[in-house]
């Protein structure tokens, strides 16, 4: 496994170096919209293991919410998306070197990233939520006093839970959460009343409950932590590209196409308020 990882890292490094020495090096210096229209192709970098945003299904096909959304956006402009699986740790480098044209895969907008990347409007909200059975009658997190909470081991949700104890940690039983290796394992315990609630990303909660046709049996409550929003990352020079993506977002939401894709993957509308109010 280590040899394989070393080999893959070596290959990626060679590709990056090759990209620097090829025609791709000119991309960061100009607005490339006319080229995208002429070539009728754009390359999007993504992590092909990030369920449900963008991943490979059992047949090897690229699927996911972001896959459907991006394909729909560029279909409006007659441009075909070429999906390029990348090392997520090198995403900004791949973009800078011209090996990809966009970063689009549950990509959070941060001040640090804004220094090197131009972002589209934020299109999707994500936050930590608490999943409970409807039959429990839990309406907000204060109802979880001395209740047993579950969380996925090593998740950002569990980290946030510990970093902000006043929000939830100091309320639940033993001031801690039972940890699980997978959401499915935790959901089984929740269904069988071995835990009273489950802390998880809204993205995953909506997806898994929707796929298993169990949304009607559970409530998804705001956990009380700050939310985050996803946006698309482009090169600083690609001003027109970002403008065109934003225009497509607003048009798709107005026409209901965004909501259709959202409900397909999550069972609800996950658009940001900015997108809804335009």
Predicted regions: what they are:
Residues 26-106, 255:
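Extracytoplasmic small-molecule ligand-binding "clamshell" domains
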Residues 48, 125-132, 202, 210-247, ...:
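Periplasmic-binding protein-like
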């Amino acid at each position: 496994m280590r040899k394989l990882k070393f080999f893959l890292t070596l290959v990626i490094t060679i590709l990056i170096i090759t990209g620097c020495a090829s025609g791709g090096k000119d991309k960061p210096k100009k607005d490339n919209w006319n080229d995208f229209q002429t070539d009728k192709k754009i390359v999007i970098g993504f992590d092909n293991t990030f369920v449900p945003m963008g991943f490979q299904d059992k047949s090897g096909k690229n699927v996911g919410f972001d896959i459907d959304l991006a394909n729909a956006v560029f279909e409006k402009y007659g441009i075909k998306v070429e999906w390029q699986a990348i090392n997520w740790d090198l995403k900004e480098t791949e973009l800078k070197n011209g090996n990809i044209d966009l970063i689009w895969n549950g990509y959070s907008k941060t001040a640090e990233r804004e220094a090197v990347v131009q972002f589209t409007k934020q299109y999707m909200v994500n936050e930590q939520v608490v999943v409970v059975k409807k039959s429990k009658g839990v309406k907000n997190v204060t109802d979880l006093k001395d209740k047993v909470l579950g969380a996925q081991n090593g998740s950002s949700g569990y980290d946030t839970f510990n970093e902000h104890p006043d929000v939830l940690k100091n309320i639940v039983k033993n001031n801690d959460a039972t940890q699980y290796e997978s959401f499915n394992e935790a959901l089984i315990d929740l269904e069988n009343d071995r835990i009273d609630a489950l802390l998880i990303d809204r993205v995953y909660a909506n997806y898994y409950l929707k796929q298993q046709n169990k949304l009607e049996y559970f409530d998804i409550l705001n956990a009380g932590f700050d939310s985050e929003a996803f946006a698309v990352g482009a090169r600083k020079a690609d001003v027109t590209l970002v403008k065109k993506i934003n225009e497509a977002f607003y048009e798709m939401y107005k026409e209901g196409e965004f909501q259709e894709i959202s409900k397909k993957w999550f069972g609800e509308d996950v658009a940001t308020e900015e997108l809804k109010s335009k």
